[in-house]
Swiss-Prot record:
Reaction catalyzed: Transfers a segment of a (1->4)-alpha-D-glucan chain to a primary hydroxy group in a similar glucan chain
Full protein name: 1,4-alpha-glucan branching enzyme GlgB
EC number(s) given by UniProt: 2.4.1.18
Subunit description: Monomer.
Gene3D superfamilies assigned: Glycosidases, Golgi alpha-mannosidase II, Immunoglobulins
GO biological process: glycogen biosynthetic process
SUPFAM superfamilies according to UniProt: (Trans)glycosidases (SSF51445), E set domains (SSF81296), Glycosyl hydrolase domain (SSF51011)
Any one GO molecular-function label of the UniProt entry: cation binding
A GO term from the CC aspect: cytosol
Active-site feature positions: 318, 371
InterPro entries, sorted: A-amylase/branching_C, Branching_enzy, GlgB, GlgB_N_E_set_prok, Glyco_hydro_13_cat_dom, Glyco_hydro_13_N, Glyco_hydro_b, Glycoside_hydrolase_SF
Length: 640
């Protein structure tokens, strides 16, 4: 098995070791010989096609090179008894379109299939694969990769901007190309102060409305935006602007369109044999057979492909619950227990551990993030310590609780105070990312601004309050595009964000400015990210003031030299002469206030320093007396 971290060779032949490791489920670079690759055999240049179809009777390659005719010379030959097929076609070349005609050995029924390992495909609604051998790119991100390999993300800032390329911006109603995005996106992300972008899936998918989460071409770059070189150039540009790139990745299930992986050889192949495990009724997709060696090779090699070939810095693994649970989205009687009688998918668990183990061993500095909504334990615990091995987990509980809380009339918030404090009870059980993702601003859930309570002023104030509270809460951060300039309509994947409102309305411009300042504040204050997962980094001052709906807490740096005091007022009431216990004697200065006039607030800021007095309060020996603005987060810092 070849072990490499550079782009694939222009010529690569299949060896005995490749075949052995592939069928053993241990090949992590299967894309180097599976699919369509440039080859020179007996002095003749051409393309070697290789695929896996264990229940095929025959496979013929048709395409531009043979006028899409089934010809004897283009039939693949079986090279193993376990379903590997291959053929060399001399006159096939880069850019030719092609498909496989796969005939099932039991029924003699044939189907036209796209190549599962194709690097590029036709733009929907067309479905042919495209021979793509010219993929070499001269990268200029060596410094970034060196830095990545040495970075401990747990004690560094991580503030992620999630986006959907097709609807971030368009040009005259058409998709922007990767090269066009390279001209605008990196600069915007850098100016706004985000540390990473997270792209929703970039592999090929037939339905725009699936957002990429129902893929057909796992190795095919999304052709809506251009080609492989264009995407590499975009990632390179982001890295050169000191921005990491995370990719949403979907290893649990696949689209059931007939040209794709479904019943690839006329029978269950990439999916489970058992229909109750194979068919995902909720999403109308098929679940991968994660216990089958060749399927594991397909998926783990796919993760390696995106990381090695496109220098992706992290994978956000989609729908992990669907991989972990046999009864996910199924009623009683619709699923079969495992060999121990439980609902755990033992094959899925083993796959996730193997995936994370491989990436940890081979891809220094690359992270994996689990989108998982259950209480499954030890998701972000290393595999060697009994966990699944992810680096981070989205905190879906925090997201649900706090969005519910922030939508309540402040009159009733005191009765639901636990919604805004409960997350700290379990925060240290995982390495959490606080995520407000695309799923929260679509399908009738309302835009983020419209989740806020009240009239327009209170909605804007509530958004600033909520985002400032989020920045102060331990854990890394993620926000979905459009929230930063207050898009009032829900996200629509078929049109660009409503950027025009920034120029048309001062309130949108002020909020965009607020997000930039908040992001800069986060990045510059080590207390906000250095101890996200260390008990030392967070301490409540008062978590129990439900009557006034006020939270107060301390964030600290590792050396304890930097301390920030957060006071979050979730009511539209100004509190005068508020007594607050503080950990140290001295002078305190306001360093951030979401009620600032420049953000669109009422301007109730602390213009002068406040000195503590030796009077006990909230369990501390020192106390300060402050004014707390309405619907706002106030952040104080000890300066002397």
């Amino acid at each position: 098995m070849k072990n490499k971290n550079s782009e694939q060779n222009t010529h690569y032949t299949i060896g005995e070791q490749d075949i052995h490791y592939f069928h053993e489920g241990k090949h992590i670079y299967a894309y180097e010989f599976m699919g369509a690759h440039k080859a020179c055999e007996e002095g003749i240049e051409g393309i070697r096609f290789t695929t896996w179809a264990p229940n095929a009777k025959s496979i013929c390659v048709i395409g531009d090179f043979n006028y899409w005719q089934v010809e004897d010379k283009n039939y693949m030959e079986p090279i193993t008894d376990a379903g590997l097929w291959s053929v060399f076609i001399p006159n096939a070349k880069n850019g030719d379109k092609y498909k496989f005609v796969v005939t099932n050995k039991d029924t003699s029924h044939y189907v036209y299939k796209s190549d599962p390992y194709a690097f590029f495909s036709e733009l929907r609604p067309n479905t042919a694969s495209i021979i793509t051998t010219e993929t070499q790119y001269t990268w200029s991100d060596d410094k970034w990769l060196e830095k990545r390999a040495k970075t401990n993300y747990y004690d560094n800032p991580m503030n992620v901007y999630e986006l959907h390329l097709a609807s971030w911006k368009t040009k005259n109603g058409k998709f922007l190309t990767y090269d066009e995005l390279s001209e605008t996106l990196p600069q915007y992300i850098k100016e706004m102060g985000y540390t990473h972008v997270e792209f929703m899936p970039l592999h090929e998918h037939p339905l725009d409305a699936s957002w990429g989460y129902q893929p057909t071409g796992f190795y095919s770059v999304n052709s809506r935006h251009g080609d492989i070189i264009g995407l590499k150039r975009l990632v390179d540009k982001l890295h050169n602007n000191d921005i990491g790139v995370i990719l949403d990745w979907v290893p649990g299930h696949f689209c059931k369109d007939q040209h794709g992986l479904i019943y690839f050889d006329g029978s269950p192949c990439y999916e489970y044999q058992e229909p109750t495990k194979a068919i995902n009724k909720g999403w109308e997709t098929h679940n991968f057979d994660l216990g089958r060696n060749e399927v594991k090779c397909f998926l783990i090699s796919n993760a390696m492909y995106w990381i090695n070939e496109f220098h992706i810095d992290g994978l956000r693994v989609d729908a992990v619950s669907n991989i972990l649970y046999l009864n996910y989205d199924r009623e009683d009687g619709q699923w079969i227990p495992n060999i121990y009688g439980g609902h755990e998918n033992l094959e899925g668990i083993a796959f996730l551990k193997e995936l994370n183990g491989v990436l940890k061993h081979t891809c220094k500095g690359v992270i994996t993030i689990a989108e998982e909504s259950s209480s499954w334990p030890d998701i972000s615990t290393p595999v060697e310590k009994g966990g699944l091995g992810f680096d981070f987990k989205w905190n879906m509980g925090w997201m649900n609780d706090t969005l519910r809380y922030i939508s309540l009339d402040p009159v009733y918030r005191k009765y639901h105070h636990n919604l805004i404090t409960f997350s700290m009870v379990y925060h240290y059980s995982e390495k959490f990312i606080l995520s407000i993702s695309h799923d929260e601003v679509v399908h009738g859930k309302k835009s983020l601004i419209n989740k806020m309570w009240g009239d327009l002023w209170n909605k804007y104030a509530g958004l600033r309050l909520y985002m400032s509270y989020m920045i102060g809460h331990p854990g890394k951060k993620l926000i979905f595009m459009g929230s930063e300039f207050v898009q009032f309509v829900e996200w629509r994947e078929y049109e660009q964000l409503q950027w025009q409102v920034v120029d048309q309305y001062e309130s949108h411009k002020q909020t965009l400015h607020f997000f930039k300042k908040l992001n800069d504040f986060y990045h510059n204050e080590t207390a906000l990210w250095q101890c996200d997962y260390d008990h030392h980094g967070f301490r409540w001052i008062d978590a129990n003031n439900s009557q006034q709906s006020i939270l107060s807490f301390i964030r600290s740096s590792k050396d304890n030299k930097q301390k920030l005091i957060f006071i979050c007022n979730f009511t539209p009431v100004t509190y005068y002469d508020y007594h607050l216990g503080v950990p140290d004697a001295g002078s305190y200065k306001e360093v951030f206030n979401s009620d600032n006039l420049e953000f669109g607030g009422s301007g109730q800021v602390m213009a002068t320093e406040i000195f503590s007095s030796p009077q006990s309060s909230h369990g501390f020996e020192q106390r300060i007396i402050i004014k707390i603005p309405p619907m706002a987060t106030l952040v104080l810092k000890l300066i002397k």
